[in-house]
Structure formats: C-alpha cells, structure tokens
Amino acid sequence: GAKSSKTELLGVSSVAGNYPIEITTKNVLKTLELIGRPDIPVAKGMHKPLTRPLPNDPFSHGSDGMGEIFLPEPTTKISNKHGVDQIIDVVRANPGEVTVICIAPLTNLAMAIMKEPQLVEEVKEVVCLAGSFGLNRYAFENATGDNPQAEWNVYVDPEAAKLVFNSGIPLRAIGLDVATCTNLDKNQLYSLKNSSRKEANIVEKMVRYLERRGHESYCVLIDSMAVAAVLEPSLIEMIEVRVGIETKGELTLGQTIADFRKHHAWEHLPKIKVALKANYKRFIDVLMENILR
C-alpha cells in the first residue's frame, strides 16, 4: 500500500499484538525504511489490550518478530503523537476520505472511537484482518488464537473488536477462512529470491523461515489480503451478516460468531460485511506486482 499509486499512506499506528509494543513499533520503522518510505509518520499506540494482559503468541515469528530476517536497526524517529491521536487527527483532517486498515488487534481504533465518538461518522471505512466466519472448510483449521475457534487479532483484544464491530462504522472484515486459502508457488518464490529489489528478497526469506517451522506461505499473505481489499475491492466478494464477538467464553474467547439464520436471527448483533470468497489468482498477481515493481 505504501508503494501503490492508487493510495496514499497517511500514517501508521503501532499496537501490541504478536509482540510487545516496543518491538512492533520498531518493526514498522524497519519496514518503512526498507521500502524507502521513512517519511510516513509512525506513532506508537496502545501497549496492552483494553481490559486484559497481552497474551503470548503461540505462533512465533522469530526473535525479531519478522521471521528472523534481522533488518537494520531503524534510524527514523517515531512521532510525538500517540498512535490513537494520530488516527483521530488524520481522519479529522480528511473527513470521509480515510480508510483505516487494521492488521493487528483493534485496540487503537477502539480507543480512538471512545475518545472521539464522532469518528464513526468521519471514517470512510475500516478494513480489517479479523475473525473467521465459518464460510469454508478452512474456517477453524488455521485458527491463530490460543483456542480452536479464534483468530489472533480478535483473540488478543475481543473487547476492542466488539466495540469497533458494534460502533456502526462502515467495516469489511477479512476472515482467516478466506485469507488462508492461497500460497506462493515455487516460481513466484524464485522470482522474489532473484529480484533486484530488497523487499522481494525479504519476503522470500520470511516464507523460507515459515517452511522450516512447518508452516505455509499463506502465513505472510493474510495481512496483505486486507490491504489488497482496499487497493482492488473487486478481489474479494463480501456478504453482509450479523456478527457477535465472544468476550467471556472459557473455550471460545475471541470467536467471531456469524448468524446466518433466516429466522430467529439475533437482531441485536451488528451487521457487517465479511469476506465470502476471493479471486486468489488476481490477489497473488497484485501482490507480486507491488513487491517486484
């Protein structure tokens, strides 16, 4: 997205998720320096979920949080603003024009909405990698929360996800059930490895790290699908459905419960758009075009 001519990345707010806030913030800076965009403002956001301690991620991304690629230490400084305030200020400066892409727990956005409730009327839309909605056989096979039903971003801060989903903000959720159905093939990995572009080489290294740990390349693609849904909305077919977030379940904390019933549906649940299916070939083409160009 930062390199796309179709969009303008106005800022990044880090948040505690797979790793503590200091590591995630540093990794944002490293990534922006890697792609030659150190000018994009980075603000450090929430260091813990709204009401819970930050859980340890059972799916390790290596000691650096990026698949053991060990990018150089960043020289760019973070913004003086808090990550929550950066969201508020950017949206306020561009009412009706800003899409907020969330590829981490929704803590920052939830805090922004609590601080400035009017924000829900000013954001163009939210597109998030969040949940799993039971729409194919992969729905819970690749669950990333610390239980068989939850996706990590919602599991980490289910209260934040519930607040955002219930806020009335225009929202598209890309679930794991749709996002985990595609991988890079050998030819694509070869192109990345042999590219003259450093960022392409880095993506290939990330995939190789995952393969050594017994995982597939979709693990580095799922967040990209949320970005691709903004760059090219026709890539992903959405369906509107009522969705609830489990915040109290002993075995199902963080589960996103989609109510598809025609009769006796839970009318109190918010209606949101969730991914039904994707054009995976086109998604990979868009991804490769953006990495290799």
Regions found by a protein language model. Give the residues of each.
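Metal-dependent C-N hydrolase catalytic cores
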Residues: 25, 29-30, 34-93, 269-288, ...
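Short, functional N-terminal and low-complexity linear motifs
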Residues: 51-58, 75-78, 127-130, 173, ...
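Short N-terminal helix-initiation segments at or just after the protein's N-terminus
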Residues: 44-47, 104, 219
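Conformational coupling and interaction surfaces
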Residues: 1-9, 152-155, 159, 163-293
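Short, mixed-charge aromatic SLiMs
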Residues: 19-23, 50-51, 132-136, 244-261
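Generic secondary-structure signature for well-ordered alpha-helical cores
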Residues: 33-38, 47, 92-96, 114-118, ...
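Active-site histidine-anchored catalytic micro-motif
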Residues: 1-30, 64, 70-173, 179, ...
